[in-house]
């Protein structure tokens, strides 16, 4: 298959919907020779910040000299972003070849039972694990797709698990309370395997503590056993002190990145107990070198243009606070949100820095329409317009902006991906 044909086949699997459970992915991987058993791993779940934590952890491990893998989702601009080895995205050719191999196994599975048809995410996960095995990855950092307990990635046996802060999300699949969602995310905790968490809310943390105790998994908490201090946040980066280490400046903006750095640090200091050595200099160098686009990403000055993928009210509040601190308290918001998110809560959170907004609908069949998003924004803002696409909204905003204006694109990875693709002159795919 050529690249476009491969993407067409993969995206066609989305018609299978979301099927939580490990049976199909386990069978698919078995037919492929169990590639996930050929590398060691770190597993990261949570709601806000798990992608950043994964990127930081991978950068730390690579700085120590390990051959690394990084599996995250979804992507911003190009599908190949999801699967990386030692900082390099899978090539289109490698993706096509592995997809062709996996497709053969999928077709064989379907001959046995139509119920065995793997989903888009299960197939993508299998491709990632096969690529890691072929590339000789020593330690892969794997981000959960949804939840944790029944997520396709939960077939790995990690050296450490991590759980970021938890919010209400995917309630139709994970449950309608923080306790239920925490139980699903804590499903990645393995017997005797260290777990670190940034969660400190009574409901969710209580569930994590209970499951960790039941599985005799040593638990370390950011802000308790894992100490950190946010030293400074500027447009040049975020300076943080982790434990007894010297201060380090991350090239990522936002106070919230200090907590993510603390969680990555917690992972790094737990790994030696599993025989995976990580030096202090690797921690510092990895954090200095980390790159993670779309997270309070400053893409232009005069006018100021910032992209952020925040998609929960908690995330939006954190971003709004950082935007106010770094750029002032008046911004034009371009917002596009998926329909399984708390649109009203997100709109309300961003209203603290904006009374002007352009509502859009990202190119996803799960997105709120521009009209629905605009209706939510009008509850909190007075100047709200709607645009037919993210690209048109951004081009219009930039064309009419003065040098002192601030433009924020937010609400979803899909929204930011389309904005980034337009900004860089590419097509999101």
Identify the meaning behind each predicted range.
Residues 71-74, 198-199, 211-233, 251-255, ...:
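Beta-strand->loop->alpha-helix junctions that form or flank phosphate-binding loops
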Residues 38, 134, 139-144, 151-162, ...:
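Nucleotide phosphate-binding/pyrophosphate-handling subdomain across enzymes
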Residues 412:
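Active-site-proximal loop/hinge segments that shape catalytic or ion-binding/gating pockets
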Residues 201-220, 235-236, 304-307, 313, ...:
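C-terminal helical cap/extension that packs against the catalytic core
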Residues 146-150, 157-216, 343-344:
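Conserved catalytic-core segment of NTP-binding enzymes
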Residues 22, 26-30, 34-37, 63-156, ...:
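ATP-dependent carboxylate-amine ligase catalytic core
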Residues 57-62, 132, 350, 377:
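Hydrophobic alpha-helical packing residues
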